[in-house]
Amino acid sequence: MATVKAVCVLKGEDPVKEPVKGPVKEPVKGIIYFEQQGNGPVTLSGSITGLTEGKHGFHVHEFGDNTNGCTSAGAHFNPPGKNHGGPQDNERHVGDLGNVIANKEGVAEVCIKDSLISLTGSQSIIGRTMVVHEKEDDLGKGGNDESLKTGNAGSRLACGVVGIAKL
């Protein structure tokens, strides 16, 4: 059974340096590692720093294009054309990985196992963009059209392209 590994370096925009009292907030950044054995689930591990405390939407977006920042990454990766949902839902985008949770220091430790994304084949996320969002993903339960598209997760704080890693 072959093992495939990948990595994603998340980088946020530099914060606006305004004349305010207090420390300047560091940009959001992180490293996420992916591993898949055969056709099994993909395990994601790593950490993200510079977040506000609480939940932040975490998704795979359709394009590996970051030429215009995280906006160039397009919508959530969704080849079957389904509505947005949570990682445990049958009705969800392939790229819907739910939320990461940042502690009071702004650090989110990522430990996710997902059976819908893949590092090979038609559901492969290789060459696509991972995005961490400003707000909590409502998992498609927000009761409005935007919830069924994005989970009302807000702006894109940091992103990076998923690439094959050395075994």
UniProtKB/Swiss-Prot annotation:
Subunit record text: Homodimer.
Modified residues (Blocked amino end (Ala)): 2
Cofactor info, note text: Binds 1 copper ion per subunit. Binds 1 zinc ion per subunit.
S-palmitoyl cysteine lipid modification positions: 8
CDD domains: Cu-Zn_Superoxide_Dismutase (cd00305)
GO terms assigned for molecular function: copper ion binding; superoxide dismutase activity
SUPFAM superfamilies, A to Z: Cu,Zn superoxide dismutase-like
Protein name in the entry: Superoxide dismutase [Cu-Zn]
Protein function: Destroys radicals which are normally produced within the cells and which are toxic to biological systems.
Reactions catalysed: 2 superoxide + 2 H(+) = H2O2 + O2
Protein family according to the UniProt entry: Belongs to the Cu-Zn superoxide dismutase family.
InterPro entries named among the record's database cross-references: SOD-like_Cu/Zn_dom_sf, SOD_Cu/Zn_/chaperone, SOD_Cu/Zn_BS, SOD_Cu_Zn_dom
Cellular compartments annotated: Cytoplasm; Nucleus
Disulfide bonds: 70-159
Binding, Zn(2+): 76, 84, 93, 96
Alphabetical UniProt keywords: Antioxidant, Copper, Cytoplasm, Disulfide bond, Lipoprotein, Metal-binding, Nucleus, Oxidoreductase, Palmitate, Repeat, Zinc
Cofactor(s) listed: Cu cation; Zn(2+)
Sequence repeat segments: 15-18, 19-22, 23-26, 27-30
E.C. number: 1.15.1.1
Keyword presence, S-adenosyl-L-methionine: no
